[in-house]
């Protein structure tokens, strides 16, 4: 699933798809020889962002994850039968896409994300959403993306532990108070703020003020706070 509004050119997209197909074809030959294929075929119906959030919790239940943080999402997805290819590129117009070829669920992510683990984890969770969510065909591209974004955030930051760490409803945010949340869930500061807004812990004004400050401080290129 490539995002239709991606800034990636058609030729660049096709090159990535071809490279990925070659990689997965070779990968599957090796698995055929070793008779080691695990098929990932989990689908959960949803038609709204609220149902997408519930689908994330349902998948956590199916995988016996409780509400604990996801320590290694890439390894978890591979253990469940999703094939992952890290495509070597510095082109930040591409972050990832997912597809199913010959019943094999596949995710391709950009190698530049390895320098930004919180972003990499959110991209993986977003592509997991596209593989898992069984959405109505008449939903718009934006609605598909909104559902995938909410699923990804809920999967990485379940409501109960997140709300407790965030401290309930807030009318101000201190950046340093978000660092423990970033470290615990392995997500970026903007992802935390968007999740807090989604859960009605902060309002529109506070969300907007945060992003103005975040951009002004240049945190998009060099975000403070450790991710462990």
Model-derived segments and their meaning:
Residues 1-228:
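Active-site hotspot residues in diverse enzymes, especially metal/ion-binding acidic/histidine motifs
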